[in-house]
Amino acid sequence: MAYITKRGNSYSVRYTYEDEHGKSCDKWESFPTKEEATNRKKQIEHELAAGTFLIPSSVTVAEFLMDWLPKQCSKHKWAPKTYESNLSTIQNLIIPYIGSMEMQKLKPYHMENLYTTLSKTPCGSYIEGKKQELTEKQKQRFLSGTTIHEVHRLLGTAFQYAVEWGILVKSPVPVDSPKKSTQERTIWTVEEMRAALDSMEDPILHLAVHLTLVGALREGEIVGLTPEDLDFDAADGIGTFRINKSMQRVRKEALNQVDDGCIIKVFPDKLERSTTSLILKSTKTASSCRTIFMTSALKEELKKWLNQLAADEMKDPARYHDSGMLFRLPNGLAVEPVLIRKKFLKWQDAHPEFPRIVFHGLRHSSATYQLMISGGDVKAVQGTTGHATADMLVNTYAHIQQSSRVELGKKFESGFYAKPDTPSPQAVPAAGEPTISMTALLELLKNADPEVKAQLRLALLT
């Protein structure tokens, strides 16, 4: 039951409710007119009778999210990077803008205003929740639609829990999500991949890129390899390497929050008071665990690399720190993913004739090339790339090469404009050229067994 009391020039509604602990509490709400107070009284009595009454709460968005995050991490057994990524989104993209607002005062238009603000916000404006001083150049790079979509996704999930926990009656997050960015990734052609590999003199970079091009690996998977993952005699001597681990550098705060079941090893800190740790963890999904065929050139390079590791250890055994990893510095310490990226950036600066791509673009290039030479055998390529679903592979890596579009245009012209009783014009092969058609060749490749496909990659990459 609710009561109205006139207090000076305003009207107060007093009512009693039970909090989350079952304790009886009195609440007063003030209104400027009797009509508003009467409407609120009726609303309260209806909600109390229907069991839909929302317990008053002054908890802020920041307080709720920082309470919700570790609970979700524990419930869903997040990997350290997942926790770190979500924490970063909350600290840098949500709390600075709506963190001080009370949850129960949030409306859908507040969410829309947040998305609009973020779309005009430069990247890196906040790091670990602290405002950053940006250069004029940095101020011109704004958050992408994909990043804002991720904010929407996180808030949508979090606020649904707020409804379940009785903090909100309804989530204020709009149903329509911000549009993701659709910028096409830059990739290399096979000629560019081969030429780039030939020009790389740094042994660590050369091996890392070679492995990526053959196996479409992620950065963490490359440096997560150990010598035990190599089998030079497998597949009738073709040789294979196994992907089942990944190396990452994560914040210690994230490491302390997650279930350590997926963590294989935490490497010793190089610096005192370090706020991050280098870890070796199992791959994120079952499909990420896979075996990849070697090429003969890669096989020989790996053997030479193992000999170099043994030689490095013999130079000064007392000061050698055997990390147990395949990628090591001359002193035995593990090579981190960031070092591979830095080496690749340095190489790109020295070779401006190649299209500028991020290191992960090599994985895209390899996957796209393998889709082409396999005649679109998505399942075979999926076994190499480790994508969870075939759709994910196709949607992410089905780049259209310019040469393929030109060939498609020629085929359309020869087929579309040909008269019904006139055979389509055929290109006349030059002397010494094979006469097998592209269609027949792709069909042969599609139906070939994995060993033949591995040998084909060997021929193309050597």
What are these regions (language model features)?
Residues I127-G145, H149-V151, E164, L168-P227, ...:
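Basic, Lys/Arg- and aromatic-enriched nucleic-acid-binding interface segment
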Residues F232-A235, K245-C289, K410-T462:
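C-terminal secondary-structure termini that scaffold catalytic or DNA-interacting sites
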Residues K179-K180, I187, K245-R249, T385-K411:
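Catalytic-site neighborhood detector that most strongly recognizes the C-terminal catalytic loop/helix
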Residues C123-I127, D198, D202-P203, G215, ...:
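Short, basic (Lys/Arg/His-rich) helix/loop patches that form interaction surfaces
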Residues R7-E112, E128, A310-D322, Q402, ...:
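N-terminal DNA-binding module of tyrosine recombinases/phage integrases
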